[in-house]
Design a protein with these regions (language model features):
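Conserved N-terminal entry element of GNAT/NAT acetyltransferase domains
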Residues: 2-68
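Acetyl-CoA-dependent GNAT
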Residues: 55-56, 60, 67-145, 156-166, ...
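Residues at secondary-structure transition points
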Residues: 128-132, 150, 177, 201
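Conserved glycine-rich acetyl-CoA-binding loop
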Residues: 139-157, 164-166, 170, 176-184, ...
Length: 214
């Protein structure tokens, strides 16, 4: 069933209340035409889902992650990164920090990238002493065929907004010392290298810990 047909079917027999409380049939022609004009905002995936993008990047869109997106995200994680996590880990991050778990999708609504973060409270990376509410960028990835479009930066910027909304005063991440492209992007976003974790990754490679104030 096409999106427009599904919207029409869902509207039949339903009412809304205006003020004063006067019921108006949703299938009233005026109301129907207004709702139909909103159809481009909807996407049919076995059901009608309102698809509101936080940002558009060319033919791509950045939006919050949905539970049904997780299988695609896990596949991207395995395809694009050497660091992998359990299914339950992804589920926990989405449940705990939905504002900072975002996806990028193309014009066919195929997910091609994501960013996953967590909100923490602990010692500050930006101050010599003291505690801070921090946003931790756990994992960010874009499929190789879609890189070079600014999607990684867009995902980062939108996730940082989510961290600010959650009251974080700073953010941090770990990155392989050999990942020049990612390091350059983070520096362009005003991240600073705080320290080096030697042998941080399972294969023995070192990691830079990078941080910035929000």
């Amino acid at each position: 069933m096409r999106v427009a047909e599904r919207v029409i079917e869902d509207m039949r027999g339903r009412e809304i209340l205006t003020w004063p409380a006067v019921p108006i049939k949703l299938f009233h022609p005026i109301v129907f035409n207004f709702v139909l004009s909103l159809v481009p905002l909807f996407q049919f995936r076995g059901r009608v889902v309102q698809n509101i993008f936080l940002r558009r990047v060319g033919k791509y869109g950045i939006r919050k992650c949905l539970v049904e997106d997780l299988p695609s995200i896990i596949s991207i994680n395995w395809a694009a990164l050497p660091e992998h996590y359990s299914d339950s880990f992804f589920e926990e991050r989405l449940r705990e920090s939905p504002e900072t778990f975002l996806v990028a999708e193309d014009e066919k609504a195929t997910i091609i990238g994501y960013i996953m973060c967590r909100i923490e409270y602990g010692f500050s990376h930006m101050k010599k002493y003291g505690l801070a509410r921090k946003g931790h960028v756990v994992s960010v990835a874009v499929l190789e065929a879609h890189r070079g479009q600014g999607l990684g930066k867009a995902l980062m910027e939108e996730a940082l907004k989510g961290m600010r909304d959650r009251g974080c005063s700073e953010t941090y991440l770990e990155v392989r010392v050999s990942n020049d492209a990612a390091i350059t992007m983070y520096r362009n976003l005003a991240f600073q290298t705080v320290t080096t974790h030697h042998g941080y990754y399972r294969d023995g490679e070192d990691a830079y810990l990078m941080s910035k104030a929000l």
